[in-house]
């Protein structure tokens, strides 16, 4: 691992004064105490397990208080994203989603699936929706099986987007035929987020 890679992988530490003296946290653990979760980078099984564990932990800690997920992701594995989605819908606390940077593919679906009225995007963030990608190779019968699975996944993802955006299934199917990029304002108009803001809102501070 070169010096640049090591530097990029460094996680800042913060020091907090407690009744027992100083305690050091990595920045993400400290923010988790404030019920802030970061979904950053490609969505794979490892990331999904981390996000699901954090959601379940915060629910156990306080089932009545909102959880905030900050999303900056190009998307990733559909089944991993669905594990996060199902957990967001399953737990009792309302889950607010905030797009910083980009929310593409499964990242966009998770952004849209936040609690109604609590889905946000920063003004220069980008959102992209599209159909699931396939690239299976092998025997013709196996290719056919995987093709039918992709079509089933596509139908289910379209249903979820339609549910959370208020768009019709026909509109979602048409708009996800190809990569469909949207600005934060366009994402709000489409129903992917509820609000675009450049400064932290007072109600978001209080819900945290």
Swiss-Prot record:
It is found in: Cytoplasm. It is an enzyme of class 3 (hydrolase). GO terms for cellular component: cytoplasm; endopeptidase Clp complex. NCBIfam families: clpP (TIGR00493), PRK00277.1 (NF001368), PRK12553.1 (NF009205). Keywords: Cytoplasm, Hydrolase, Protease, Serine protease. Its main location: cytoplasm. The gene is clpP. It catalyses: Hydrolysis of proteins to small peptides in the presence of ATP and magnesium. alpha-casein is the usual test substrate. In the absence of ATP, only oligopeptides shorter than five residues are hydrolyzed (such as succinyl-Leu-Tyr-|-NHMec, and Leu-Tyr-Leu-|-Tyr-Trp, in which cleavage of the -Tyr-|-Leu- and -Tyr-|-Trp bonds also occurs). Its EC number is 3.4.21.92. Coiled coil: none annotated. GO terms for molecular function: ATP-dependent peptidase activity; ATPase binding; serine-type endopeptidase activity. This is ATP-dependent Clp protease proteolytic subunit. It holds the Pfam family CLP_protease.
């Amino acid at each position: 691992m070169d010096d640049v890679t090591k530097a990029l992988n460094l996680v800042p530490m913060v020091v907090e004064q407690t009744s027992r003296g100083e305690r050091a946290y990595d920045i993400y653990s400290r923010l988790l105490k404030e019920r802030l979760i970061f979904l950053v980078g490609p969505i794979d099984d490892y990331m999904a397990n981390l996000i699901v564990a954090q959601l379940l932990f915060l629910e156990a800690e306080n089932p009545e208080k909102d959880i905030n997920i900050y999303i900056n992701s190009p998307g990733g594995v559909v089944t991993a994203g669905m594990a996060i989605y199902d957990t967001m819908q399953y737990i009792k606390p309302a889950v607010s989603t905030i797009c910083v940077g980009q929310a593409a593919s499964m990242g966009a679906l998770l952004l849209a699936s936040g609690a109604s009225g609590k889905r946000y995007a920063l003004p220069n963030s980008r959102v992209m929706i599209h159909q699931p990608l396939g690239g299976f190779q092998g025997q013709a019968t196996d290719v056919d099986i995987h093709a039918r699975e992709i079509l089933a996944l596509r139908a289910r993802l379209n249903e979820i987007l339609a549910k959370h955006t208020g768009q019709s299934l026909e509109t979602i199917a048409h708009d996800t035929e190809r990569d469909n990029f949207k600005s934060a304002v366009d994402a709000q108009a489409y129903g992917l987020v509820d609000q675009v803001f450049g400064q932290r809102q007072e109600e978001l501070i209080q819900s945290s």
